[in-house]
């Protein structure tokens, strides 16, 4: 079953001579349990694709469905409920709550969904431990490095019972070892049935995906199923 369906999705900004086509007739389907990596040069539309897929921005035309629901036909409140219950986000600003510790930030989505606090904290601590952050669980965001905050945000996105993960450069501030730990965590979440769309410039990390989609000038230029390895992807994004 497709968790995310995008059909002929376009996004245009501005008018007349100033018109910019960020996305052009995008078709993308992501099934439960699948990880799709999105690659392409800067300005190719990767981040716009994520914000539209996550109902944070409306397309100029086309249809977007998450868990079978047409986002373009839902009310604002219904879209907000769908985002909270079904979609995990990792964007480059991390968006951690400053008054909560790392463990509390990770556990929060579970508690909002009614998971008992003790069980939610246990799941949060396990996710942090898998990313090498067990000793940072009681630290507040301003006590963490940028890379540590990034890993906390990723743990929070995958620990809940979300159906879809949308991640923009989840390994951007991380070294190779921590980047691979992040991809292992996302891969494990997909094995449990979550669908994931990961924007990355890193061919090594994209090779974890079941499929790689290449964007250029807002269009899908190619798709590669089950990448053979990072070397096979490098030429596509140059």
PLM segments and residue spans:
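ABC family nucleotide-binding domain
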Residues: 2-208, 215
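Conserved beta-strand-loop-alpha-helix hinge in the C-terminal portion
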Residues: 219-238
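Short, low-complexity, intrinsically disordered N-terminal peptides in bacterial proteins
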Residues: 1-2, 235
